[in-house]
């Protein structure tokens, strides 16, 4: 083991005869902004799913802050400080913006909030949960929309809310799966500014197809193709790697 906040060792995921993730070794350091790129079908989202517990790997190990979490369910990984946003917006559309954030905040105050009916009590009975919720709403600039249903928000604001939901769990590491997908250039800039602002003190692992954006924000980049690590290094090193250029320009697909 190293001092990495996240480490995968030989992580492999097979679906029948298809190997979607193939012996991936990955180490994300504390405070690092790491990006994972690769052609469509390279195994990026499957890798995220194995790290977050949405899928169990066929082989290999996932370590988080020195603990083997390979077999832990997703909610236990969240409690340990691992957060994730999804490629497709993942909010409770019928609930108010405040309630979306509050439900996430409850996960880090769970010992204070005992009982099966906790989520239905008045928010003022939660003490720290209510204060934490309001703080998150302020940080993501959605306090003025707190009592609106999430489904009424503009798309960019729904993505902003999703980042707030992740932030509310107070994660040490955040996995961001194409957080700017479907956005205009202006929305993309605003979303990345928000991420770099409110998540600046966390370790970040990003999947993103906008290569210019990746080159701008990343400390290091890992390139996947056919489920394997093709290259890893600084943005300058990746930009100058012939194998990486061939993988993209050569149209490698699965």
Regions found by a protein language model. Name each.
Residues 52:
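Helix-to-loop junction immediately C-terminal to a conserved catalytic motif
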Residues 60-67, 79-80:
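Conserved ABC transporter NBD signature motif
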Residues 113-145, 152, 193-196:
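Conserved ABC ATPase "signature" region
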